Amino acid sequence: MNKTFSILTGLVMTLAASLCAAQAEDAPKVTVTPIKGPLYMLDGSGGNLVASIGDDGVLLIDADYAPWVEAHAAAIAGIDPDAASPRFLLNTHWHGDHVGGNEHWGTQGTVIMAHENIYQRMSTRQEMKALGRAVEPSPAAALPVVTYEDSIAVRFNGDVIQVQHFPTGHTDGDSVVFFTEQNVVHIGDHVFENAFPFVDIGSGGNVLGYLSNLEKVLAMIDDQTIIVPGHGTSLLSKQDLQEWVTMLKSSVSRVAALLQSGRTVDEIAENGLGVEYDSFGQGFIKEPMWIGFIAASL
């Protein structure tokens, strides 16, 4: 009897340990990439975060999806075990993969900052027709409490963080964040590394505005600037950004020329833009959708 009980107990303990190990493997894991000084890129499931961690505390750029909040908190604790909840959180735009964690941090007392258009979109029901979904208003704790129309400056952890609104690009509320002392830029969803970008036409985005914004950013940075993309695993250089912009501009020119020749959007999508663009359509936005964004923006 005792021997049987011991065997059963051992089996139960082994099964429990296996389940715990499986759960640990399935738990969200954030990849931490040191950038420079107090700055770190946190790569989870949605848009990339930048964390400034230092004597003034923690400041976050973007918040990923809600289920990833604890993973990001653990990543921050791994960098600095004494770090408290972020003092500030700044959203680059309103999409859920960038603001999903807002509610959690808002209830912890984090001051959330964003462009006024982000507040307006988060506080009202939004239709994302390109993706076939509706987004309900966010809870009060998730909403920005500090908003701006053009720009805002934050002095934190020895840096002057310049936040500049770039309208009519990815959406109508996007900001690019310049860490001026470190020469680091979080460019938000104005960059999808090695992929066609999502341009949210229904939220005031426009492909031509997107390209115009990127040209402006290129004029504001130098060859030593480190760029954090909204999506992607790599830190980028000015040259990387220039090459990506060149690809996007050439695809826009090709679609415009085909439309001018009498081709329909469906015909262009069916025939494709050419093998040189194939690799860029392997991400979230496939080539036919990118062609549609271009046509809707011309």
What are these regions, as identified by a protein language model?
Residues A22-V30:
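Cleaved targeting-peptide boundary
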Residues L15, L19-Q23, A219-I226, T233-L298:
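Accessory terminal helices/loops
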Residues P38, S52, D62, H93, ...:
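Divalent metal-coordination and catalytic microenvironments
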Residues V30-I76, V177-F179, N183-D189:
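Conserved beta-strand hairpin/beta-sheet module of binuclear metal-dependent hydrolase folds
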Residues I61-A63, S85-H95, M113-E116, H186-G188, ...:
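Active-site neighborhood of phospho(di)ester-bond hydrolases with catalytic His/Asp-centered motifs
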Residues M1-V12:
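Bacterial N-terminal signal peptides that target proteins for export
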Residues A77-A153, D172:
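Active-site HxH/HxHxD metal-binding segment of metal-dependent hydrolases
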Residues G57-V58, Y65-P67, A153, V160-S250:
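Metallo-beta-lactamase
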